[in-house]
Amino acid sequence: MFEAVTPLLDEHAELERRLADPAVHADAALARTLGRRYAELGAVVVAHAAWRAAADDAEAARELAAEDAAFAAELPALQRAAEEAGEKLRRLLLPRDPDDSRDVILEIKAGEGGEESALFAGDLLRMYLRYAERHGWVTEVLDANPSDLGGYKDVSVAVKTRGAAAEGVWHRLKYEGGVHRVQRVPVTESQGRVHTSAVGVLVVPEAEEVEVAVDPNDLRVDVFRSSGPGGQSVNTTDSAVRITHLPTGVVATCQNEKSQLQNREQAMRILRARLHALAQEAADAQASAARRSQVRTVDRSERVRTYNYGENRIADHRTGFKAYNLDTVLDGDLDPVIQSAIDADEAAQLAATSV
């Protein structure tokens, strides 16, 4: 049982040996990649050891149960513990999203609803920043286009873990991509009527510079003056940067920093992440239908959830999750909502595979 564990245990031991070599740490990118994989496999090693111990305890009790009533009484609980440990290990052995240990770039864009949508985009930004704070993640606003009333027409944020982690930011935030709908009375509404607005969220794994080779000849770089609420110029120099990748048409813009050089660096980070995501989508499209069902069981391009302020209700339309604690969710208590998507994804994979 669990024959697939053996090569993973061997890989974990080999990574431990390599990470003990000081020469590996001379290459920061390599050390980070190996460290993340080591942490990911470490969870499998621990779960396998726990399952073996629980299975051995249950087997020993089973052998002694015929002779000793005390062991017979303990057997059901020991068998349940072994089954639960096996289920945890089985989930860890599911095909892993290769980007799960990565950091992300999260983009929030106001959509249907005008200024109210922009205000809700600001509310979502605060929610994600508070959620990141709860997890000890590091956030950095890469670009922001504020609206007249203090919301955001669009905003891009980098979210990073501190050091190597088996479950990176992408592991949890990848389920946030899609359309988020809000139902509430806007601050601009004088009659007290409830309006429905929508905000789009895009989450892409951040790519290392060495992973996405970009030919400078494939880029068109435009510079312009940064603008603030209402479109007024907030800088007297052409510091804002727009980079277009000509072969794909992918565009990244940044005007958040004071210097053109800084904005160009941030725009390139966004561009690399988008190109990486584009390449991953192409690879998924070429995969078999069965494989796609394993790695993309929760569609991140569809309507994600509804936030109803009047009822203090949040509802996830993909998983059926519903709760009446919208105020705490908007304050960063997102884990139960996201966990419902993770559980649904893993359940679908378990149903489609035999691990």
From Swiss-Prot:
| Record PTM N5-methylglutamine, positions in chain | 232
In terms of superkingdom, the source organism counts as: Bacteria
Name the UniProt key words of this record, in alphabetical order. Cytoplasm, Methylation, Protein biosynthesis
Its encoding gene is what?
prfA
Answer yes or no on keyword Protein biosynthesis. yes
Annotated compartments: Cytoplasm
The protein in question is named Peptide chain release factor 1
- Check the record and name the SUPFAM superfamilies matching this protein: Release factor (SSF75620)
